[in-house]
Amino acid sequence: MNLSRRDFMKANAAMAAATAAGLTIPVKNVVAAESEIKWDKGVCRFCGTGCAVLVGTKDGRVVASQGDPDAEVNRGLNCIKGYFLPKIMYGKDRLTQPLLRMTNGKFDKNGDFAPVSWDFAFKTMAEKFKEAFKKNGQNAVGMFSSGQSTIWEGYAKNKLWKAGFRSNNVDPNARHCMASAAVAFMRTFGMDEPMGCYDDIEQADAFVLWGSNMAEMHPILWSRITDRRISNPDVRVTVLSTYEHRSFELADHGLIFTPQTDLAIMNYIINYLIQNNAINWDFVNKHTKFKRGETNIGYGLRPEHPLEKDTNRKTAGKMHDSSFEELKQLVSEYTVEKVSQMSGLDKVQLETLAKLYADPTKKVVSYWTMGFNQHTRGVWVNQLIYNIHLLTGKISIPGCGPFSLTGQPSACGTAREVGSFPHRLPADLVVTNPKHREIAERIWKLPKGTVSEKVGLHTIAQDRAMNDGKMNVLWQMCNNNMQAGPNINQERLPGWRKEGNFVIVSDPYPTVSALSADLILPTAMWVEKEGAYGNAERRTQFWRQQVKAPGEAKSDLWQLMEFAKYFTTDEMWTEELLAQMPEYRGKTLYEVLFKNGQVDKFPLSELAEGQLNDESEYFGYYVHKGLFEEYAEFGRGHGHDLAPFDMYHKARGLRWPVVEGKETLWRYREGYDPYVKEGEGVAFYGYPDKKAIILAVPYEPPAESPDNEYDLWLSTGRVLEHWHTGTMTRRVPELHRAFPNNLVWMHPLDAQARGLRHGDKIKISSRRGEMISYLDTRGRNKPPRGLVFTTFFDAGQLANNLTLDATDPISKETDFKKCAVKVEKAA
């Protein structure tokens, strides 16, 4: 569909209004008069905010983009990265053909990259897959995917691995950012994802940020919070962090605490609520139940590590029946005096924060991102903030609630909702539940027993298995884990380069990961393919393909579906399975999984006239619609309802559950959520008893703390101008010039004590590796004494040479925020 910007906006204005009101109306296919630039709607490629954009194309290239003024999320605004979206696609080193390490025309793990055909690449891959399966079984092959993949790419990966290969070794890079949040949602409410939405911002009286620099990481949402704060003098903003950053500029209360003591701070708040009779007993008695967590649960390190000795690591996720009295006893030791000493916050700061949550007249929204999630007790801190909101009843109502912000455009839609984790299936189903496996097998038309009950390997376990030779093939898609993941030198790189292992990286650019792989597959980007993302407020948004990918680059979806043709059921399935469905004998996995009468049932005629759609044209049917409608069957009628496919192309996103054409803004609350019956008031229907869990857990120390040799805390993160590993943003000249290289931020007195000055070339070292960088004592980030901060966007400075691969033992998410380092002047 080619529209001028004016006609596009006119055609969608009524739809935007109708969608906001929960209505649906038909939209005609308006074809604009010839215009130099043709416009269509899209979704920003960066963070999890889900900003809508208008994409302008000319002569087969994206030449312009702007914020969509009719979009509810961003209201016409973009951040600095969003304004340069077109340029992410046109870096000079864009990959356009498959590249395989070769010597004399044959694969050689130590050879140089040489161009090959797609067929040669896939035949080589298939050979390596089959060798690995034969050597080490179904779990010898792994997929590390992405919260940047489109919804149907994530769904196809899940289906190929869990149904086709009968292996649950699929993990997304959301493991590094959202796993703790997802696990805590499931443990607390029996369902994943936030109950509120961005509309809370305009109705809240107070905002509390826990480990979240929204000013730089979610700037569009921060602009809405800023507007709310400036236009309402009684609104308050509190920011808690281990160092000062740009979000402190708006804060009424800026609190810098000692790393890991957020656990103690929240237990103090709970103690304050109890001691000051600030518990909403009516809410608590009707809608909650009490549990206590297993303690001394270890740090997700290798079993032989000293920190794993004599721990309850094997039962880390267990929750025991408990009571309010037991919670009261546990938190009683977290007095204001003790927590002040532990955290470094003064008593007034702590009491002011506790009073904010305790005040029944104040609507409070708590936001957090990686400061909570990338934490060796990330699940606990997530559940502790839920405790506070549940104990006060400040949840599931406009302007009140706990809200986990995502960092990737579809960490929710693709990683979590699709179930791209090694223990999950779509719509919060899990592989360990036989009834859930039966649902998947029914929808996917598979023999009973096809989906394995064995939980696959998470990414840190994949790294270790590759290093140990127990997993032999890894396919990495749409991420740069060799730069983004922890402990590069000791685990990941040795495993990737180990003789006998084979690594495939699908990427549009020659990243650190790609250059460490054996085979590089060139991928289509952003609007070079039809796509869908799910943002942090449960909003599912679609866009159409608007330009073609360069050269031989293909979408990840095409790669997955085409690769499925290189395997047959006879090779991958047991005789017991084939005997149940003999009609599947000899068929390719492509035929069984994708050309199955469901995915392929929508003809090409359902595409908009003149609409690009390379995958559908290649396979001969409307691939995306078929995949989506099959996927949506998992959640409809179960609180995860998605609208019909065609609705999303007409709207600017819809927040699930979408029931009878109406989206849901606040879940679990009568009058807002169609799954809450009249008279229930609140129903946390993820659990059969419709009650949420309040969990009693203590403070436990981090895996590594500063000592005499490594005397500083290291925290890693991002800056406004760059996104993750900089694969896209460093190829935008304007963004690169604005922030060309990584820095290490340090307190001026810490620098002085080491004989260092602002701008010095330094060496920062940990027990795992080192990095050469430059010192900043005057910039936007202002660490307290004893802590340094750095970023990971710079491929020339691999910050994750330093980080420890300690994880939360429950969520398996890495703690990138706390390890011990030393800093000295570089030679």
UniProtKB/Swiss-Prot annotation:
SUPFAM superfamilies xref list: ADC-like, Formate dehydrogenase/DMSO reductase, domains 1-3
Source organism superkingdom: Bacteria
Signal peptide limits: 1-33
Residues engaged in binding Mo-bis(molybdopterin guanine dinucleotide): 81, 148, 173, 177, 210-217, 241-245, 260-262, 370, 374, 480, 506-507, 529, 556, 716-725, 800, 817
Entry's Gene Ontology molecular function annotations: 4 iron, 4 sulfur cluster binding; electron transfer activity; iron ion binding; molybdenum ion binding; molybdopterin cofactor binding; nitrate reductase (cytochrome) activity
Major localization listed first in the record, in broad terms: periplasm
Gene Ontology biological process: cellular respiration; Mo-molybdopterin cofactor biosynthetic process; nitrate assimilation
A GO CC annotation given for this chain: membrane
Domain spans labelled 4Fe-4S Mo/W bis-MGD-type: 37-93
Keyword Ribonucleoprotein: no
Cofactor field: [4Fe-4S] cluster; Mo-bis(molybdopterin guanine dinucleotide)
Mod. after translation: Predicted to be exported by the Tat system. The position of the signal peptide cleavage has not been experimentally proven.
Annotated residues for binding of substrate: F792
UniProt keyword 4Fe-4S, yes or no: yes
Keyword set, alphabetical order: 4Fe-4S, Electron transport, Iron, Iron-sulfur, Metal-binding, Molybdenum, Nitrate assimilation, Oxidoreductase, Periplasm, Signal, Transport
Cofactor: binding details: Binds 1 [4Fe-4S] cluster. Binds 1 molybdenum-bis(molybdopterin guanine dinucleotide) (Mo-bis-MGD) cofactor per subunit.
SMART domains: Molybdop_Fe4S4 (SM00926)
Pfam families per UniProt: Molybdop_Fe4S4, Molybdopterin, Molydop_binding
Uppermost EC category: oxidoreductase
InterPro entries according to UniProt: Asp_de-COase-like_dom_sf, CT_Nitrate-R-NapA-like, MoPterin_dinucl-bd_dom, Mopterin_OxRdtase, Mopterin_OxRdtase_4Fe-4S_dom, Periplasm_NO3_reductase_lsu, Prok_molybdopt-oxidoreductase, TAT_signal
Sequence positions that bind [4Fe-4S] cluster: C44, C47, C51, C79
PROSITE patterns xrefs: 4FE4S_MOW_BIS_MGD, TAT
Family: Belongs to the prokaryotic molybdopterin-containing oxidoreductase family. NasA/NapA/NarB subfamily.
Protein role: Catalytic subunit of the periplasmic nitrate reductase complex NapAB. Receives electrons from NapB and catalyzes the reduction of nitrate to nitrite.
Subunit structure: Component of the periplasmic nitrate reductase NapAB complex composed of NapA and NapB.
Protein name: Periplasmic nitrate reductase
Gene, per the UniProt record: napA
